[in-house]
Amino acid sequence: LPTPVLNTTLEGIALRTGRGTVCVVGNLADGEIAAWPDNLSGFKSLVVDMGWLKERNTDRNVCLFGYYEGEIAAGTTAVNVVLGRLVCRLNIAVSAKTAGIFSNVRIQLQNAQTKGYLFPSDVYLSPEGGGDYTEEVVIGADKVLGIAPLYRYYYMAENVTEGTDSGERTRLQIKAKKGGAEYTKAIDLGRSDIHDYSLRRNNNYTFNIVLE
């Protein structure tokens, strides 16, 4: 697919000549940043609270950010900036190894990161708690899960962890009923084979959950 391109004109803004950085922010509501700094170091310290993503149907206007860094000659009227999402997308696929066994299947994203730096940073924020998303029903109590996966999608601020601290990892909790009993399982999201549990901004991750 072609890369989306937005051509827009900003009036009343003069680009400073010389080497500099032009920062562009999209889909950020008025008032989310109390005061915009006029220097790059101040811009790099800005943190955006994206806790509102915990509720469903609020993921269509996630914040975008990009920047141009280089020489700006006198008379320059246009620069090209590539925008990326401040969040990562989690694609959760839930299915059963054998159809007709599991019912009342629910999932919940837990210990999710809700804040992130606006400018890409080598310093990362740890989850502060309160990052549990609303529990979501995958299939109700009156139906059974089949072998064809059912998908749920989440957006989350990036959670970059060293992997050694399990308390910083984002988890997916799954609840399901089987044979009249309810079972609960929590899975740390990431690459367990290489002990990498980081979920980085502007990336898509797919997790296939198969109930047995």
Model-derived features: where do they sit?
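Extracellular beta-sheet/turn segments enriched in Thr/Pro/Gly and aliphatic residues
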Residues: K44-L86, A93-K97, G190-E212
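A surface-exposed, glycine/aromatic-enriched loop/edge motif typical of exported proteins
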Residues: W36-L46
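Tryptophan-paired
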Residues: L1-D38, R89-A93, K97-R201
